[in-house]
């Protein structure tokens, strides 16, 4: 959403897969893949393993923020069995995988550690980021996504970001006509007011 709010992206897709994982994709600039000058690791690893590393490393990059202050990506990674990042940026498609596994040396679960180096998959003209993750069932009692809860939240985000197109796909849905929903509201909040008043008689137009 930060990419959208700052004019770098116009569409987002959210997919719930049959294996319990979920994917979120945007058409923004893509997660940086260059080496961080101070930490000596790729931008993908910084953003997905370090707290407060959002904003593409530069606080001036975003005039507006969704409010998570750079912790969202790293927290999702830490709470996932595995997470795969696909970043399309600078003419290349890059991929990196993270997993949470037991570390015998430390005698504890090591959450969200990189298990593959950042790999350049191919050249591409595409730009944006796709993240696929599986919630960790050793952390959460319930890991099954509630489609209606996700759908409601995405609808609200579409209302709050006028002109943004959000596509929601639930692969678990048996009815093909209900698998895909697209939210896009050119009127923004005014459309939202009309939506919540759809079963009421308005006093003013």
For the regions a protein language model found, what residue spans apply to each?
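Conserved ATP-binding N-box helix of the HATPase_c
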Residues: 1-12, 72-79
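Structural motif corresponding to the C-terminal cap of alpha-helices
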Residues: 1-8, 51-59
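Conserved catalytic core of two-component histidine kinases
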Residues: 14-16
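GHKL-type ATPase core
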Residues: 18-38, 43, 54-186, 192-195
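Short basic (Lys/Arg) and small-residue
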Residues: 47
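Short, intrinsically disordered, charge-balanced linker/junction segments flanking boundaries
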Residues: 200-205
């Amino acid at each position: 959403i930060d990419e959208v709010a700052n004019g770098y992206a116009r569409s987002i897709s959210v997919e719930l897969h049959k294996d319990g994982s979920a994917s979120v994709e945007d058409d923004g600039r893509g997660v940086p893949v260059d080496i961080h000058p101070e930490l000596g690791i790729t931008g993908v690893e910084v953003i997905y393993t370090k707290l407060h590393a959002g904003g593409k490393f530069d606080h001036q990059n975003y005039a507006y923020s969704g409010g998570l202050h750079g912790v969202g990506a790293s927290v999702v990674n830490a709470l996932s069995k595995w997470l795969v990042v696909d970043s399309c940026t600078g003419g290349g498609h890059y991929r990196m995988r993270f997993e949470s596994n037991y570390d015998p040396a430390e005698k504890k679960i090591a959450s969200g550690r990189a298990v593959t180096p950042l790999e350049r998959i191919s050249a591409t003209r595409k730009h944006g980021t796709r993240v696929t993750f599986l919630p960790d069932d050793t952390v959460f009692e319930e890991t099954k996504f509630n489609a209606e809860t996700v759908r409601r939240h995405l609808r609200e985000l579409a209302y709050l970001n006028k002109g943004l197109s959000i596509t929601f796909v639930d692969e678990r849905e048996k009815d093909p006509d209900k698998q895909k929903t697209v939210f896009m509201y050119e009127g923004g909040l005014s459309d939202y007011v009309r939506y919540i008043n759809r079963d009421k008689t308005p006093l003013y137009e």
